[in-house]
Amino acid sequence: MYAWHQVPAIDMLFNQFDDKSPVAQFGNVRAVKELRSVANQMGYIRTLSETYGGGGWDETFKDFKRLGDWEYVLGVNFMNQHLSHMTLTGARKYDYPPVFTYHSPWWSNYKSLNDYYARLSWVMSKGVQDNDILVIEPNSTLWSYYSHTKSSKQLMEVGQAFQTFVTTLEKSQVEYDLGSENIIKDQGAVKNGQFVIGKAAYSTVVLPPLMETLNKPTFDLLQKFVLQGGKVVRFSSPNRIDGAENSELA
């Protein structure tokens, strides 16, 4: 859905760092990289994050900066603080604090930190991130294991492997974009030996671990990309197209 948002957005809840779980909030590299990648590919200027929700009444300015700096270095450039109550009557006291109003004792001192993120947001929205590596997300493989009636061990294994993979790339300071096959279907092309998605172009495409199937449009573009001299780095060997085994991948 990010591709169709004029300002694509995520939220980042809580104040516990976790860079391992695919469903984590603070520490989830994949979530922010998906956001930034789509903005790079679609040419969007702003990337929004609803931040701080559920961190608790005891969340400090140090926590605020730690959370904000982490997501900004990964590509967020517009913050929406969660949240501002008109009143704390009743259950509102427990509705995912902190609260960014005069109800919080630090409110009168918050301007300095807010000005910092205002300036950082402005600066980070003025440049263009030009990444040369595309990591295709294993969406098709994940959907092939999904069931709304029961849990899937394979689904969790693929998700965890991908989470670990992109986090390892980030810790190794590898700059890359993530590629959604759904967006590739609509925005993908191959031009002059480059794998193109919208306004972004890549000379290297990476297939992550445990990828088993590709969409037909993705496969066709990869074939054309290789014929034009593009580089494909495989950490897995998919053997299915649109979920069906295909001899072209043998």
Where are these regions (language model features)?
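Carbohydrate-binding surfaces of carbohydrate-active enzymes
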Residues: M1-P8, M12-A250
